[in-house]
Amino acid sequence: RWHDVDTDDFVARLNQFYADTRFHEFYQQHQEFYEEGLRTYETNVMQYFHQEWYARFYGTEPTEKFRVVIGFTNGGGNHGPHRQLSDLPKEVFAIVGYYVNPQTGKAYEKGLDYASTLIHEFNHSFVNPLLNDDSNIGMLKEIGQNLLKLSPIGMQRQNYAQWNIVVNESIVRAAVIIYMLDNGFSVEQQLKEIFDNVCRDFRWM
């Protein structure tokens, strides 16, 4: 989302901020809080995330490195930045929001609600490269354009206004449902996933 940014200047300023605010001391003072958040996420959310399924389902290893970061100061929002270092696999980050139930004071109580984001995003590591193949573009372009015509406003609102993005998102969302079938999710959980997609204008799910 950043354009024409001097990254060297940004990193220099970030390092200066780290020093000026004595951030390392702040982290040490709150280390138990962060570690408890990680333990809770591991227990409540990661139990639903079975990374070995992906290579088995797609028949290939991922071409990207997938990393999960808890955004303790981000509220409930999720972000998906990436970086490409020379001669190294592309790294894709799922920066997941930190949410605490205000009634109970506990974090990530409904683990599946948060795991679905990981399950979805990791599928993109396998699905997105498919449209780098010209033969796949030839087969899927017309389909993607037709799907886009079925729900142009809904797709536009979600920044999915290009046929290739609609194809990627559709395949990923279908793969999530198959993931749930293969990993013993309840019928209610599967139906909720389908219903959520229909509500997001992916009515062909």
Locate the predicted segments by residue.
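Auxiliary, metal-adjacent structural segments of Zn-dependent hydrolase domains
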Residues: H30-V92
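Second-shell loop/turn segments in exported
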Residues: E35-N44, T104-Y108, D113, R157-W163
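Post-HExxH zinc-binding segment in Zn-dependent metallohydrolases
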Residues: P129-D201
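Active-site scaffold of zinc-dependent metalloenzymes
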Residues: H79-L112
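Active-site recognition of the HExxH zinc-binding catalytic motif
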Residues: L112-D133
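Short, flexible loop/turn elements at secondary-structure junctions
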Residues: Y58, I70-N74, Y99-V100, N123, ...
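Stable alpha-helical elements in mature extracytoplasmic
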Residues: F10, G37, H50-W53, Y114, ...
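Non-catalytic architectural context of zinc metalloproteases
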Residues: R1-N44, E61
